[in-house]
Amino acid sequence: MQQYILNQRRLSRETLLLVFLTFSAFGVLAQNSYRNELGGRITKTQFEEQILTGPYFGVPGDQEGEMVLVYRMPVGKVENPEIFYEKTGNQEAFSQNKNLIVVYYPGPDECNSNSGDFDANAMKKAAKSLDKWAEKHNAVAPIYVYKNYGGLLAYEEFMNWQADPDGVFEAEFFSYPYPCKSFVVLHPSGEYRAILGDFPLSQIEVALKKLNRANR
């Protein structure tokens, strides 16, 4: 099973250190090596410090026993943004220069199964805020995408969840099962802003504003 180390405010420093010790125990035979988000080699101490103090996850690398830092707030540009509009049935929105707001749910995990943010009333309130921001900041109605449907039944009345179409969002933005949920806001220019793993809802509006400002 793939494992990841997560950096969240609601987790204590002691909890994170316990996770690190667990990784160390399982990694003795594998001779773990560590890399930063650019692929450069770093020490275990540097790896752990980045997760404890910065916006990073630690995820398994391509090689056995390798752990790699992943920056939680990626900003970039995709080569073919139109495919994401097509896969979600929003071709017209692409031609109208509208943003896509995508909330990605990996499936039930310890984070979203025990978070007050996933209370039905909290989710309903969040959905209303996203609808309002979408209309205000030139975006299509929010798109709710899942990898594993488990745990979503309680939100069906006010959120239209759909399977990740052909896995395009996982492949491009969410290659690991980042905890709780993640989001990406995509502009027709291909520019995007995302947060991997649990996030303050207000950051979606921040992303919309920044993308609109950059693409005037």
Identify the role of each PLM range.
Residues 31-134, 140, 146-148, 216:
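Non-globular targeting/processing and membrane-anchoring segments
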Residues 106-109, 149-151, 191, 200:
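Short, solvent-exposed loop/turn segments at secondary-structure junctions
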Residues 188-193, 197-216:
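Thiol-/selenol-based redox modules, centered on thioredoxin-like
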Residues 1-35:
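Bacterial Sec-dependent N-terminal signal peptides
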Residues 145-150, 196:
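Acidic carboxylate-rich catalytic motifs and surrounding loops in phosphoryl-/glycosyl-chemistry enzymes
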Residues 149-178:
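Thioredoxin-like thiol-disulfide oxidoreductase module
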Residues 170-199:
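Thiol/disulfide oxidoreductase modules built on the thioredoxin-like
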Residues 112-115, 155-156, 196-197:
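Short, solvent-exposed loop/turn and secondary-structure capping segments
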